[in-house]
């Protein structure tokens, strides 16, 4: 019993060297490939594409060169905006050309939204996220639902209660790792099991990649116009906004074709 009390005291002690930090969910576009012209070239591949053309040495200029050459043939081809609108809005929609482009997003999101995004395995091609199994999460990032503060004294009370609950969970998380390792448990097992003290509002960093078509699927199902949870809707809207904000607006006509 004496040993149990000693362990309990160690677990309850504050761990001031770990920084609790409340954060909004955030999204950044790390990289991308493609644009309106690439979608058009992919659509024209079935009818007009001639790869015998002399292409520029700059590989990044070849999509535009192909687009210009195909349109210059003048065989009653639609303009790029008209073609993309036709593809997105025909019945049934022909969206495979929109899969040619690629986005890579970095994000800091809470666990609940991370789990929801994992269900979209068709739209999202790839996910890598930091793992509490392989490292001790030292930053203790967490999310608090700010809209609770709009609901008077009770909303504020539970907002503060959630914050205290989260901080306590983080203390127990670090305390459990230290105490269990000290008791002889392997550090890997201590880390992977102590994470059960982390709540659904614990945030993690992740990298996700998807095509333009995948992003539009995600937007249609999880954007702010949908009945989705506020947090995932905000993340999806931020992803779309990051694409809108790319210098030169290379996806302008593709976004318009989907009414975005």
Residue ranges and their predicted role:
Residues 2-260:
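Family-specific signature for flavin-dependent thymidylate synthase
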């Amino acid at each position: 019993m004496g040993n149990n009390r000693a362990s309990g005291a160690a677990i309850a002690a504050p761990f001031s060297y770990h920084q609790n930090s409340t954060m909004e969910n955030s999204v950044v576009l790390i990289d991308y490939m493609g644009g309106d012209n690439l979608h058009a070239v992919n659509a024209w591949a079935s009818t007009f594409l001639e790869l015998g053309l002399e292409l520029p040495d700059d590989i990044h200029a070849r999509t535009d060169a192909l687009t210009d050459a195909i349109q210059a043939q003048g065989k009653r081809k639609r303009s790029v905006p008209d073609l993309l609108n036709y593809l997105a809005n025909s019945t049934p929609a022909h969206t495979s050309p929109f899969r040619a482009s690629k986005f890579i997003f970095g994000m800091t999101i809470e666990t609940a939204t991370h789990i929801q995004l994992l269900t979209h395995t068709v739209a999202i091609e790839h996910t890598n996220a930091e793992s509490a199994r392989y490292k001790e999460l030292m930053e203790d990032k967490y999310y608090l639902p700010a809209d609770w503060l709009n609901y008077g004294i009770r909303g504020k009370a539970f907002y503060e209660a959630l914050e205290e609950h989260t901080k306590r969970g983080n203390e127990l998380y670090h305390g459990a790792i230290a105490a269990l390792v000290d008791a002889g448990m392997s550090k890997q097992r201590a880390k992977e099991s102590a994470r059960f003290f982390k709540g659904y509002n614990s945030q993690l960093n992740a990298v996700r990649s998807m095509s333009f078509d995948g992003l539009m699927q995600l937007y249609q199902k999880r954007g702010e116009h949908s009945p989705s949870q506020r947090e995932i809707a905000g993340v999806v809207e931020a992803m779309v906004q990051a694409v809108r904000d790319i210098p030169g607006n290379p996806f302008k006509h593709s976004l318009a074709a989907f009414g975005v």
